[in-house]
């Protein structure tokens, strides 16, 4: 190949690269040019929906008008599949969670891949699982509880919407402590809390926001936090490790993702906007009121987190033989 031809090829590549960079820059400057849709695979009014609306409001003021599209059903898979199939243009986002991106794929599988089907944008917040017992259980500490459970194998029960996060938390706790407790299926956790207070249900594994009213009223007792550190909502409740147990960590978490193939420039911009919002005292306070801790990080860190969580939840689902109800 002659030197002249090599120069022409290099010049052509340089022009192509320059044109590509110009197009990317122009696209970034024009985004968004229309409304952004945030799919929330939960019903309106619950804690996940409330957090999603906090984030949507922040994006509306910092990036562009963002509207909520609630698509609940099938353990979050209906809305999640819709997001995975959307155009990767930055105008359809998903409010992802430990249910949609870790638990549901492990239970059902095949509909979407939590790692390959999405472009992670930002981790938003998390809350640890708490083991709380009702008046039917005499134990005051987790050590007393484990001793009591081992003395009464198969006699204690815990509320477990089949295939739901509280069910997985209970199965993880069983495996970590070697106790024999029995899951009781509930379609609505409201009934489970009623039964716990009445002494008809022995224990519940759930996030602080749902348990706190009962704990503060003295109707339930929190024994342990299933996380690496204590929660600000219950500062006197020890972690698993502090209780001399395996350092088990399981949280309910949520974050923002987009369909796989979404331009990196959009992902980067949205990540910066989310992280800026999570530094806001108002958003921190709003999340704290929901028993949730704000988290920040890069898209790459969130991608690694999703992969790790998907494996953790899948391992528990497989070992416990759980199936989607």
Where are these regions (language model features)?
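Short beta-strand->loop
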Residues: 113-124, 159, 180-184, 202-203, ...
